[in-house]
Curated annotation (Swiss-Prot):
It catalyses: ATP + H2O + a folded polypeptide = ADP + phosphate + an unfolded polypeptide. It is found in: Cytoplasm. GO terms for molecular function: ATP binding; ATP-dependent protein folding chaperone; isomerase activity; unfolded protein binding. Disulfide bonds: none annotated. This is Chaperonin GroEL 1. It is an enzyme of class 5 (isomerase). Keywords: ATP-binding, Chaperone, Cytoplasm, Isomerase, Nucleotide-binding.
């Protein structure tokens, strides 16, 4: 396929136009008075959302060069979402401001490489300053506050706060759709761990990209499973019972994995394969924990149990299992309650006895997994569209609350970013030339999120930025109440992890755009005869 190539300023301008188109669509959702975006769907009714990353994912532009810019910014939003689960709009707006300010200087003759280096140094300095100024979060009310800001809904915020407090930092909070109109919280005995499915073909719920198994049997295997003859007898027995199967082993590969995938596609047997977490002795111990929780046995050649010889009596069970690409949650395992209680007691005793901090930490992790349980927030709403939007905002709120507990919080509403400019004064003094200009571009861009939060609330963005810059740390604009004051006291807060991810990811994309000299895209098919390619940025 032949290509079209653009160079220098023309390439950068086209990419900038794409960055702007995407960012302009996303930025209207920023802040407590942010607006909604309606997305037309190929199937079913339109979706209504105020979640930046959901809007970004939907956007593809017609002009191939502009589309490059849009996709670059989209990667900022998705990456921030993956790391912190929130803050996607802030990241997008920052990236837009950095690209705009940076390209202006490049057009005026600044060296893009030096400029980019200045931007990176500034991003690191701001990230450090944010971490240093963060307040730790503990207690139900503080967590609820973070979740309320994220979901813009006090009731949901309090639910998330309660869920997080009950299961603790290491516990699992999962979000499901409720069959009723109410949103409620349930606690179940469950265990979660950070390993997901080995093949995307196992997915059963395509919207959520999860494999959900109801009332499954669970096979725990100490070693790798690769040969089909070993696994086949067990698969046949499970297929007869008609129950779905979860396999957790050191690894599942080759013929064995291929057979599970084929069976899943043909729907002859609903199965999901997951790698066991951890390594060596820790993996062994964790599999034993799972055996106790699910009421099964770990199949281990060392103890004389061979996969091809055992029957279904070694399988554990659970009420339901949810597996995503990164984690697995086993809810209501079929193991005896007193056996689980004894295991917890034994772990507590080991924690007290051990001298090594590392061992203690790992034992505590296992204890939290066993004792923590799983909080399930069941989200209800009147219509399908409202349900989807509500579920999204609960998921964001849970992610924000987790991030807040991990690294702490800073003042929200874009003011922590704006006030982090102070951290750049010293850095700028130590740099010269175009690197110093890069720091200036960054300092300028730090006002962008606040500018748009204020504009979306109907205020003058520039005035708000000027005012907040003069206020003491932690004070800023409360766009909900349209007043200036102590944001932390008012509960206008952001998890610092979210804010930092936005800063670092937007800087890395801006740097890529600034240092672009050539853009190469596929030639659109219908323009094959026409050598000009109607560009409107020259």
């Amino acid at each position: 396929m032949s290509k079209i190539i653009e160079y220098d300023e023309t390439a950068r301008r086209a990419i900038e136009a794409g960055v702007n188109t995407l960012a302009d669509a996303v930025r209207v959702t920023l802040g407590p008075r942010g607006r909604h975006v309606v997305l037309a769907k190929a199937f079913g009714g339109p979706a209504v959302t105020n979640d930046g990353v959901t809007v970004a994912r939907e956007i593809d532009l017609e002009d191939p060069f502009e589309n490059l810019g849009a996709q670059l910014v989209k990667s900022v939003a998705t990456k921030t979402n993956d790391v912190a689960g929130d803050g996607t709009t802030t990241a997008t707006v920052l990236a837009q401001a950095l690209v705009k300010g940076g390209l202006r200087l490049v057009a005026a003759g600044a060296n893009p490489i030096e400029l980019g280096a200045g931007i990176s140094k500034a991003a690191d300095a701001v990230s450090e300053a944010l971490l240093a100024s963060a307040t730790t979060v503990s207690g139900k009310d503080a967590i609820a506050q973070v979740a309320t800001v994220s979901s813009r809904d006090q009731v949901l915020g309090e639910l998330v706060g309660e869920a997080m407090t009950k299961v603790g930092v290491d516990g699992v909070v999962s979000v499901e759709e409720s069959s009723t109109l109410n949103t409620e919280l349930e606690f179940t005995e469950g265990v979660g761990f950070d390993k997901g499915f080995l093949s995307a073909y196992f997915v059963t719920d395509f919207d959520a990209q999860q494999a959900v198994l109801d009332d499954p049997v669970i096979l725990l295997h100490q070693e790798k499973i690769s040969s089909l003859p070993d696994l086949l007898p067990m698969l046949e027995k499970v297929a007869e019972s008609g129950k779905p199967l979860l396999i957790i082993a050191e690894d599942i590969e080759g013929e064995a994995l291929a057979t599970l995938v084929v069976n899943s596609i043909r729907k002859t047997l609903k199965a999901v394969a997951v790698k066991a977490p951890f390594f060596g002795d820790r993996r062994k111990a964790f599999l034993e924990d799972l055996a106790i929780v699910t009421g099964g046995q770990v199949i281990n050649p060392d103890t004389g149990l061979l996969l091809r010889e055992v029957g279904t009596e070694v399988l554990g069970s659970a009420r339901r299992v949810v597996v995503s690409k990164d984690d697995t949650i086993i809810v209501d395992g079929g193991g005896a309650k007193d056996a689980v209680a004894n295991r917890i007691k034994q772990l507590r005793a080991e924690i007290e006895k051990t001298d090594s901090d590392w061992d203690r930490e790992k034992l505590q992790e296992r204890l939290a997994k066993l004792a923590g349980g799983v909080a399930v927030i069941k989200v209800g709403a009147a219509t399908e569209t409202a349900l989807k939007e509500r579920k999204e905002s609960v998921e964001d709120a849970v992610a924000a609350a987790k991030a807040a507990v991990e690294e702490g919080i800073v003042a929200g509403g874009g003011s922590a970013l704006l006030q982090a400019r102070k951290a750049l004064d010293e850095l700028r003094g130590s740099l010269s030339g175009d690197q110093a200009l890069g720091v200036d571009v960054f300092a300028e861009a730090l006002g962008a999120p606040l500018y748009w939060i204020a504009s979306n609330a109907g205020l003058d963005g520039a005035v708000a930025v000027h005012k907040v810059a003069e206020l003491p740390a932690g004070h800023g604009l409360n766009a909900e109440k349209l007043s200036y004051g102590d944001l932390i006291a008012d509960g206008v807060i952001d998890p610092v992890k979210v804010t930092r991810s936005a800063v670092l990811n937007s800087a890395s994309v801006a740097r890529m755009v600034l240092t672009t000299e050539t853009a190469v895209v596929d030639k659109p098919a219908e323009e094959a005869d026409d050598h000009g390619h109607g560009h409107h940025h020259h």
